[in-house]
């Protein structure tokens, strides 16, 4: 598997998702005891990108898949297939969703060149932020809450934004001058 995620309602639905380097997406609805293909709507099944899941409502979720070929897909718990949101020309390499997605519907992507895009309506409309850090982005973390603070792990360190990605400040003080390849924020 190249990525594995559990449903935000796992205690009730026992659902787990996994992506593979050849077969696409699998879903288990019984704690991983058995798996079914979950690919309808995805063209290329070789998935080297990332999969994110966000809670919406008390029992629903939405999945966002950046397969690693430039495009971005979305699928909700009630949909029967994936919907392509952005084509390969977008160059999407990673996707991140707000931990407060049910309240603020914020999604952010980064391309292989470091170009950022943000959506504050559940990925229906996108705003291109360019490459404000002039670096390659390897990870995105959106802080919980209404402020939607954003942290980037980049080839030039850690960057921070408190204005939905319009501006970023380098926050790499006391970190070695090297590439940061992942970043996360506390859920609290």
Q: For each predicted feature, which ranges?
A:
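Extracellular glycan-interacting surfaces
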Residues: 1-188
